UniProtKB/Swiss-Prot annotation:
Name of this protein: Histone H3.1t
Function: Core component of nucleosome. Nucleosomes wrap and compact DNA into chromatin, limiting DNA accessibility to the cellular machineries which require DNA as a template. Histones thereby play a central role in transcription regulation, DNA repair, DNA replication and chromosomal stability. DNA accessibility is regulated via a complex set of post-translational modifications of histones, also called histone code, and nucleosome remodeling.
GO BP annotation list: chromatin organization; DNA replication-dependent chromatin assembly; nucleosome assembly; regulation of cell differentiation; spermatogonial cell division
SMART domains: H3
Modification 5-glutamyl dopamine, positions: 6
Annotated positions of the N6,N6-dimethyllysine modification: 5, 10, 28, 37, 80
Amino acid sequence: MARTKQTARKSTGGKAPRKQLATKVARKSAPATGGVKKPHRYRPGTVALREIRRYQKSTELLIRKLPFQRLMREIAQDFKTDLRFQSSAVMALQEACESYLVGLFEDTNLCVIHAKRVTIMPKDIQLARRIRGERA
């Protein structure tokens, strides 16, 4: 087979090599014995379990007061305008709402475990509500 002369061709694209940040380059070029220490990371699920224990111990309200109050007033306007609420009424409604949501998530979690999963999906919430008799 005869040799042919190669001609220069225009490149048709492709990705250009990415430039690394100075910190990444320094981290890679640092010797193994000393240099930049990797930040500590907990194993997946450890922080989630810690948060579960923390929130199960606590009794404080988890939804911020002002956003809840704005939402409550917005919903109440659909029924009657210029309604006024005592602060104790707002607190009672928030307590009831959070209690309902916590119970719903507990039931939803049972549905998730029954399905041999660990991730909550909308269908789990729908099933929990259907079993409770809230949604036909």
